Regions:
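Phosphate-binding and adjacent anionic-ligand microenvironments
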Residues: 1-74
Length: 74
């Protein structure tokens, strides 16, 4: 997950750069998996989850989204 300030954890979908990146990854996995991004209810985190067939690639994409969210919302 992406560690962010608690008051900004719900803002990830309002940031155009983050939203565009998430949409691009969703299109990439369309039909072969799914992308789920959500704010944690109990921690100052935005959870980044991707499902698909290539675990190494999924991990790489999830880390890059988490890093982007941390950079933009910290």
């Amino acid at each position: 997950g992406a560690k962010v300030s608690n008051d900004k954890k719900y803002d990830f979908d309002k940031d155009a750069v983050i939203r565009n990146t998430i949409e691009a990854v969703e299109k990439e996995f369309e039909g072969n998996g799914r992308v789920l991004i959500r704010a944690s209810g109990t921690e100052p985190l935005v959870r980044v989850m991707i499902e698909g067939t290539d675990q190494e690639y999924i991990t790489e994409k999830a880390k890059s989204i988490a890093e982007l969210i941390e950079q933009r919302l910290s």
